[in-house]
Amino acid sequence: MNVFEDCGSTQCRAIRQQRGQYVSYLEQNWKGGFDMGSSGADLSFVNLGITIEHLPNSITLFGFRIAFYGIIIGLGMLAGMAIACSDAKRRGQDPDLYLDFALYAIIFSIIGARAYYVIFDWDSYKDNLLQIFNLRAGGLAIYGGVIAGALTLMIFTRIKKISFFSMADSGVLGLITGQIMGRWGNFFNCEAFGGYTENLLAMRIRKSLVNPSMISAELEQHQIVEDGIAYIQVHPTFLYESVWNLGVLLFMLWYRKKKKFEGEMLWIYFLGYGLGRVWIEGLRTDQLLIPGTGLAVSQMLSAVMVLIAGSVLFVRHRGLRRKAGTEA
């Protein structure tokens, strides 16, 4: 059961208040990793025999603490730009055009991703508005970034008088590359996980490293104590999504030479990513909910996206087959 199902309850409000306190807790206690005064491991994939004794979430350079969350997202952006520019060059387009777009897209996508997250988790920020600007503890929603990026591309292509769908077809290859890498920022932040599981990929996390608002009643019931240290055992949904997105990217790289119309890669991205997000989001304990409901906003948005993308692809391909039959 998700602890946020009853968003009007006193328990829900109390848990949401803990999130703001948790950010301060991270600032005070996680300076490149917790010092718990114990030899217990921070994290392990118990059924794979993989143990991480100490999981840092940042590094310090010249006195400045840099979160791995931000580093990984930055690396994902660079890798995404490289993939998009490479595909643009293959198609005879000017890669510099994509670099110019990226300067705007990165800024507005980060703003959009943060705004989306804050809007649907407003109770965690309304009493401490400055925390809205603290990105080191996480809190970027990919759909907010995608929406902002799409709007930016619409404006950019209109100004440059070029095809929106033509740029989008190469752009989504870079986008999903960034998503593949970016999810590992969630790993270092010990977030974006699901409920209790005993499957092959089950991940066990030291409970004290986790934001209390992300720990569902189910996880509390299945709490594991080893050598006096409490752990939760979860679905590593960040890993599921990263691997799923890798599969979508590989398919798109294979299919791109076979595409039938401009914009097809964009719709394939929406369909492929949406299908994965529908089921993965259902596993997560930190879902952003539509106010007044128990519905996960990203899961609902994914379902709508799948229906629209699937319909567009079906109609366009049927039209192309009919046209080919008529010409024959």
Task: Locate each region found by the language model.
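A feature for loop-to-transmembrane-helix boundaries and adjacent hydrophobic helices
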Residues: 25-328
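Terminal transmembrane helix and immediately flanking juxtamembrane interfaces
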Residues: 5-6, 17
